Amino acid sequence: MIRIPKMRISLLFFFVAFIWNLPAKGQSDSQPNIIFILVDDLGYGDIGVFFQNERKSLNDRSEPWIMTPQLDKMAMQGAMMTDHYAAAPVCAPSRASILMGVNQGHAHVRDNQFDKEIGKNHTMAEVLRSARYTTVAVGKWGLQGKGEGPDWPTHPLKVGFDQYFGYIRHRDGHEHYPVEGVYRGSKEVYQNYETVQGLDKCYTGDLFTAKAKDFIIKHQAKDSQQPFFMYLAYDTPHAVLELPTQDYPAGGGLNGGIQWLGNAGKMINTASGEVDSFVYPEFANATYDHDKNEATPEVAWPDTYKRYATVNRRIDDQVGDLMQLLEDLEISENTLVVFTSDNGPSRESYLPEEYVAYTPEFFNNFAHFDGIKRDVYEGGLRTATIAHWPIHIKAGTVVNSPSISYDWMATFADAAGAPVPVRTDGVSLLPSLTGKGKQEPSQVYVEYAQGGKIPKYAEFLESHQGKLRGQMQMIRQGEMVGVRYNIQGQEDDFELYDVTKDPQQGTDLSSDREALQASFKAAALRLRVADAQAPRPYDEALVPSLEIRKPKKGLIAKTYDINSPWIPKLSQKAIANKKVNRLAVQEAPAKGNLVMWQGYLDVPEDGKYTFSANRGESHFFMRIHDISVLDGNYATDHSPIGSVQLEKGLHPVKIYYLKETQTPSLELFWTDQEGNKEEVPAGAWYR
């Protein structure tokens, strides 16, 4: 297959975008409704405006294509985010990072830890609920924790959602007919804590769309003055590649499209006909030039690819249906809708042996990149992401600055006026999306481990084909991406690529970028903590110290007045600041209820240091570099403990303490590798 170069966005795109950007009537500039649409295993190259339209424009009959008119329309009306990344190249860790707002070096769910509890900390839903949002999750979950249920440790209703409807278990999302279980057996759909009966012939993509629409309609009828947040997690196009029962109902929106009926045996209006049967007409009889010879007859697309194309087109219809509902209810203007995928394209179909094996080569779902699901090259992580919010995002916006999926918690909190927990690794993307304010750079970092190799696809560079995966890392700073595969230790070099000029990552610049190499190696240690359940070959590496010219003894103590249920990321100016000799609440300025000490910690010797604190029942948080070392910001009924490997020398530190008692006090301890525990002495602090 051929590699298609990037093409300029057409004048037609900008003309249509201009027309759609004309202001509409009827909505105030208030807290927006927020809908986060997360699809499963959709490649960057699966969406028309990101790649498939380019294939069509070349009209190469050996290169089949898929159209996504509804998603194209959404992109033209809003923002295309061309350089947006998934937090991990597989679903469970990717979703966990999204919902918790942290990178994989801080997440409780890493690697292939399917069905592991998401962790006890602030979630996207809890943050938005604090800003009076009604919160609902629809679709695939897979982050509930051990047990048979329904009382799982991190069931959606226990982590900030008011309502839930969908598949709780990860594996259930691999079958799209929960009753008939056509290929992988029947599955359980839950509404809150109860299993749902009567879902005969319900194709899950349609079912989740119907339930999402039903919630929005009922919410607007009853609580239209209260904003809502919806986490809509489709289980498609992930295998098994099952077909819907029938064509998509006409119309869309309030009175058309998929409709929730609520009757057992006829729960939705497409729960009739034959399960796993309908192929879109444009694919049913599609042919292609299989041998790249115009003199020979074309052949039909294999049924496997008719299925994949139908599933993708169905997603397009489902999103269009939902967007039409927002228009019909006159809430589109002030509803922020984000569409993205959890990782890159898959090569799985889970179909019986008589079907042709599925490969993303047929449609080039990986677009201009190398790598697929489970890779940290661009094809495994770059996601086709669209943001739509007419009142604030201009039509035709193209955002090409790098960002990552754990930025959405901070973004949604910013839009809602909610405080962002200080633990959050993400940043608000509103400046990029709206063109207002200065965009803070995203911290784009991924770590992941997976056995196996990169597929030997002809489209991929020979140097990438068959490459061992193993322990992997990716970090992006500006236009540069650093990648490590099959890591044996911290001294392994990153491959370095300028992905703005070399999206396929064919020219490794590491041989003449020694300073950048050192910077990437240091950066990758300064934003993560080790996890015993996901060990890494660099867990014992020492976090490099900094060279600081003429440091002075002591710290800077800043105080703030905050109105927040937790310690937030701070963007406002301090109301007071003072140079202090030690870490003591009594020495900080008296004004304000939040103290933040900033400076450097002088580590006397290389080694592992374990930190702990006596902070009473007050909220408390400590970062060294960008490492979350001590987190007492979620639960205040226990003392946090955190360990980190530190090189001798100075390390930047920020320590936060919320004064919540009549006699506020804070003591910080460290224990060295010999087991000696002491309060961090005043002489260890510099500014």
What are these language model-derived features?
Residues 183, 373-379, 448-510:
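C-terminal, low-complexity/hydrophilic appendages and adjacent surface loops
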Residues 41, 50-51, 78-102, 113-116, ...:
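Short, solvent-exposed turn/loop segments enriched in Gly/Ser/Thr/Pro and often Arg
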Residues 69, 98, 140, 144, ...:
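Polar, surface-exposed loop/tail segments
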Residues 533-610, 614-687:
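Extracellular/secretory pathway-exposed regions associated with glycan biology
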Residues 1-29:
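Bacterial Sec-dependent N-terminal signal peptides
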Residues 30-35, 77-82, 130-136, 159-162, ...:
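Loop/turn elements at helix/coil->beta-strand transitions in domains of secreted/extracellular proteins
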Residues 36-37, 44-136, 146-148, 159, ...:
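Active-site segment of extracytoplasmic enzymes that catalyze sulfate/phosphate-ester chemistry
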Residues 41-65, 168-403, 409, 413-427, ...:
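Active-site-proximal cap/lid insertion segments
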